[in-house]
């Protein structure tokens, strides 16, 4: 009887987990990712800069990466790292940097996971208060990267209402 209850509970939990995965994939659909990429590119052209742009799922795993124009080669690794960091911490990378400063609660977090970056430009994406993914932007100044990221987050929020 105990085994039967355990097996039933496991089946229910597996179903719930799979449903959550499907919902996440539905939210970060190819179509939505394309629209977010277009928004990032549009804003970067408005600012007159070439950027790299990444989207990660809620686990920080890559969903999309785009390098526009002559964006810095460094951005090839840095920008996906921004998206990863924002996803796994559920915070803007700029905020993670503050929390990782000497004496702060997360001091040294970046030494535990080489994918963590403390460079501004990573923003989490939430739907109904739940993390569904994150974006990373790089190629401009800190202010430009954040301006583009905030623009894309606003587009995302409008499209997922």
Q: What kind of region is each of these model predictions?
A:
Residues 1-4:
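Positively charged n-region of N-terminal signal peptides that target proteins for export
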Residues 7-16:
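Bacterial N-terminal signal peptides
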Residues 21-161:
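Flexible, solvent-exposed loop/hinge segments and secondary-structure transition points
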